[in-house]
Every structure is written in C-alpha cells, then in structure tokens.
C-alpha cells in the first residue's frame, strides 16, 4: 500500500515513477497480478522511502530549532 500519490506531494523523480506504474497497470491489467509491474513498483517504493526519510530529517531539525528558540530565548541586553 502506498501513501497518497497526488503529484503535489512528491518530487519530480517520484512523480515519473508513479506515472510509469499507473501506465503499467493500465496497459497490463491482468499481468499486473502476476508481477509484471513489480520492478517499477520496487523503484517507486524506494523513491517514496527516500522522500519520507528526507522529510522526517527536515522535520526533526525544524523541531530542534523551534525547541531551542522557545526554551532558550536570546538574552536581552540590559541598559
């Protein structure tokens, strides 16, 4: 099962693979049950996993920065 495959959610590389998989399923509607499109599906899953890892890393870094900002406010200069 794949996550939402809407084009605006993924990189161009993954969108190409999504379109290839959809086209393969459309053209080979019986053979897809016997693994005809599995190679494209494997590549798509690799791409989606890489996207997920990148987004998770960015989110973690953003969270760390926000926690630093909230819990360690900059010292104001006293006059």
UniProtKB/Swiss-Prot annotation:
Motif Cx9C motif 2 in this chain: 37-47
The keyword Mitochondrion is assigned to this record: yes
Chief localization: mitochondrion
CHCH domain ranges (all copies): 11-55
Domain of life: Eukaryota
Disulfide partners: 14-47, 24-37
Keyword vocabulary terms for this entry: Disulfide bond, Mitochondrion
Keyword Mitochondrion: yes
Subcellular location(s) per record: Mitochondrion
Residue window of motif Cx9C motif 1: 14-24
GO cellular component, one term: mitochondrion
Family stated for the protein in its record: Belongs to the CMC family.
Function: May be involved in cytochrome c oxidase biogenesis.
Protein name: COX assembly mitochondrial protein 2 homolog
């Amino acid at each position: 099962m794949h996550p939402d495959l809407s084009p605006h959610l993924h990189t161009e590389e993954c969108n190409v693979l999504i379109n290839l998989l959809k086209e393969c399923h459309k053209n080979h509607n019986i053979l897809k049950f016997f693994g005809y499109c599995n190679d494209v599906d494997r590549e798509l899953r690799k791409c989606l996993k890489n996207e997920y890892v990148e987004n998770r890393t960015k989110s973690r870094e953003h969270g760390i920065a926000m926690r630093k900002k909230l819990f360690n406010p900059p010292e104001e200069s006293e006059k």
